[in-house]
UniProtKB/Swiss-Prot annotation:
HAMAP family: RNase_P. The lineage of its organism: Bacteria, Pseudomonadati, Pseudomonadota, Gammaproteobacteria, Candidatus Palibaumannia. Keywords: Endonuclease, Hydrolase, Nuclease, RNA-binding, tRNA processing. It comes from Baumannia cicadellinicola subsp. Homalodisca coagulata. This is Ribonuclease P protein component. PANTHER family: RIBONUCLEASE P PROTEIN COMPONENT. Belongs to the RnpA family.
Amino acid sequence: MVKLHFSRNLRLLKPDHFAFVFQKPKLVRIQQMVILGRINTLVYPRVGMIIAKKYIKLAHERNHIKRLIRESFRLNQHKLCIMDFIIIAKSGLTKMNNFDIIKALEKLWHRYYRL
């Protein structure tokens, strides 16, 4: 049975973790989000988020989007390649409803599924 947890080691926490992904990322984008990915040396995928106040003004909206991203990653982590991911939110994301955000994330994750 697959464990669907989201522990601390599944997150990018330090600036050098983010810098590693920014050096040579594989880029997938839609209008409201961008996912940068880079193969890591670990045995599990990790995710980091950049949700700028410039694009999403209200804190509760930023937190809501982070929760949706974490939940989507948690449910798809066993299907993903062993990579570090950074999700960057763009303007217009708050105008989307939950279903559309989750559907967009599924579409983005699908590009990084294991074969």
